[in-house]
Every structure is written in C-alpha cells, then in structure tokens.
Amino acid sequence: MVSSTAGYRSSALGKLKAFISLTKPRQLALLMLTMYGAYFAGGGSLDPRMLALLTIMGFTSIGGVTAFNMYFDRDIDAIMGRTRRRPLPSGVLNPYEALAGSLALVIAGVLSAAAINTYVALTVIAGLYFDIIAYTQLTKRFTPLSIIFGSIAGSMPALGGWAAAAGSITTGGVLMALIVFLWQPMHVWFLGYYFKEEYSVARIPILPSNGNPRLVSSLIAVSLAGLIAVAWAFALYYGYGFLTAVITTVLAALAISRIGGFARTGERREALKLFKFASPIIAVVFIILPLERTLVYTLLLG
C-alpha cells in the first residue's frame, strides 16, 4: 500500500511537472516581464490585490495559450528532433490531460483579466484568438506570414499590462506592444534558421527555410530599426523613456552590426548567438523603462 501510494504521488508529480513544461516557463517568464514592465511604466501601483490578479492573469492566460498550442502541434513536435521529447509526443501526458489543463488555465486567465477591467480582458481574448486560431490553426502550417499573427499575440501581455495600469488602451500601451511586435522577428527567425532543416522536414513554412541569410537579415534589421523608432516615439510623447531609448538604440545597433556578419556567412552558430542576444534587448526595455518613469516622477514631485 505504501509503495503504491508513493508511486501514485510520484506519477502525479511527474505529470504536474510535465504540464508546467507545456507552458514553456522561460518564454512565459519573458512575456510576463513585458506585462509587468508595461504595467509599471504605465503608472501601475503596488496594490497587493492588483498585483495578485495581474500575476494570476499573466501566468494562466499566457501559459494556457502556450499549452494549447502544444496540444494542437503535438504531431509536428513528434517529427522535429528538438521537440519530440516534449510531454505530449513522448507520451508523458496524454492529449486529454493537456487539453483539460490548458482549458482550465485559459478560463482562469479570462476571469482574472475581467476582474481587473474590460480592456485587460479584451487583450487576453485577442491573444487567444491571434495565437491559437489565427497563428496555430489557420496560418502556421501554410505560410511564412504566420509570424505576423504570432507577433500580435506575443505583444498582448504588454498591452494588457498597460491597460491594467491606465484603465484603458491608450497610446503608451500600443507603443509598448509595438516594441514587442517588432522585436519578435529577431527572436523567431534566428531560431528558425538554426533549425531550418527540421522545420522543412515538418513542412512548416518559415522564412529562414525558404529564403536566404541576406533576406532574413534585411527584414530583421528593418524590424529592429522600427523598434528603435518606437522607443524614441514613446520618450518624446510621454517625456520619459529617453534613457531607455538610448540603451535600446545601442543594443539594437549592436545587433544589426552582428546581423551584417551573419548575412555574409549564413552560419547556423551565428544565428543561434543572435537568437540568444534577442532576449536581453526586450528585457532591458521592460526593466529600465518603468524604473526611469519612477525616477522622473519622483524628481518632478520632489
């Protein structure tokens, strides 16, 4: 009886860990950082109830959407070498367990968002639509343009964080969401280039597998230039964020210079390095901007 109970607990714990991995914890943490950063950059308070709701909303909605995508993409994951050991293709979780858990998280995400305000709930619903339906169901397997819908979905946590602070969707939230949107080609395409053979085997049309290093590099450089422009537009519009804009400019310019080298060689190792360089860029923006706002308002209010 004791060994049977211990085995059950071990199995249950293993399934819980497996389900948590479906939420892609690292990606989840980065997107929640954009949510918190936008919330505090928009003047959000340290009210415990609000922070609790925001945390629950972020974890359940972002994690739930990601887990849903894992459920729908389990056939692709079984083909690609880097994903076939994930919980669903490896059999650690069955599809019904993944679907039930994903649905529970998404429902909790929508309800907690609605408890904050209507605009936050709308960003969660928009994220669900653009990620699960527009991206995963309608475009991912058919066109490289699917990145547009995936990037819109990825920018919703930032828009929702700002809406939680401002009480509505305003210019600042749109600009912060646009920063995330313009950052994502670097994040997605360099990883896609590194694994382009696997994407080809799985018949997933992404630009790196169909194009060439120069085309990929040019489009990513344009998106980073746009990111710089949006960072400066935010600073000029709100009167704070100039330090963030300067640092963003330096990091993006450094990335563009390295992208130039990749365009000439097309080396996979360099693509992986550039993919890893993408996360610090977005992290810096969403950490420094709220700190800068706090400093500016503290000085102004004396």
From Swiss-Prot:
Pfam families: UbiA
Any single GO CC term annotated in Swiss-Prot or TrEMBL for this entry: plasma membrane
Pathway assigned in UniProt: Porphyrin-containing compound metabolism; heme O biosynthesis; heme O from protoheme: step 1/1
Localization, UniProt: Cell membrane
Membrane topology label: Multi-pass membrane protein
InterPro entries xrefs: Protohaem_IX_farnesylTrfase (IPR006369), UbiA_prenyltransferase (IPR000537), UbiA_prenylTrfase_CS (IPR030470), UbiA_sf (IPR044878)
GO biological process: heme O biosynthetic process
Protein keywords: Cell membrane, Heme biosynthesis, Membrane, Transferase, Transmembrane, Transmembrane helix
Gene3D superfamilies assigned: UbiA prenyltransferase
Transmembrane segments: 28-48, 50-70, 93-115, 119-138, 147-167, 172-192, 219-239, 242-262, 271-291
EC number(s) given by UniProt: 2.5.1.141
Enzyme class at the top of the EC tree: transferase
Entry GO MF terms: protoheme IX farnesyltransferase activity
Primary location group: membrane
Remaining remarks: Carbon 2 of the heme B porphyrin ring is defined according to the Fischer nomenclature.
Family, per entry: Belongs to the UbiA prenyltransferase family. Protoheme IX farnesyltransferase subfamily.
Function (record text): Converts heme B (protoheme IX) to heme O by substitution of the vinyl group on carbon 2 of heme B porphyrin ring with a hydroxyethyl farnesyl side group.
Annotated protein name in UniProt: Protoheme IX farnesyltransferase
Species name: Aeropyrum pernix (strain ATCC 700893 / DSM 11879 / JCM 9820 / NBRC 100138 / K1)
Name of the gene encoding the protein in the UniProt record: ctaB
